[in-house]
Amino acid sequence: MHWTAASVPGFAPVDGDVGDMLQSGDPRAMGWSPYTEWYENSLRFPDSPVAQHHRAVYGDRDYRSFVADWEAGLASWDPDEWAATFAATGARYVVLVTKHHDGYCLWPSSVPNPRLPGFQCARDVVGELGEAVRAHGMRFGVYYSGGLDWTFDDRPMGQLSDMIRAIPRGD
């Protein structure tokens, strides 16, 4: 499950298949990604549907400013309620994206991001959700994006080759 600052604007175009877009050879393909969690990358393509939507709704607001809104929403978040809902659907496991390509960690990490110190959640969303999920008899898995991190390379990523070039290789 992706639940990040990109959930605040919660927008992505719904009329494209990412596989088809990448095969098209269009150097801007991922700028038209149908995935909300790619919102920040899509903003880097000025004529993308995300960038157009963002300008119309949020003006020149920076993507990272959505983190404050997202964290404010945590005040009413109940991980046990979520876990109960997942269990009621018959789910046997829950996989949480603990850090997506935007670089924001969903736990208070003791290892600061050298490019953006403090870009992490004050609340331990990962630990709390994991505990609640297990308490409801389900397995808990995590996904961590280590290869792509837009705090290290903020160039627009339109094709797979851009993603490969953006993988941090050390300073």
What is each model feature region?
Residues M1-D171:
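Mature catalytic domains of secreted/periplasmic carbohydrate-active enzymes
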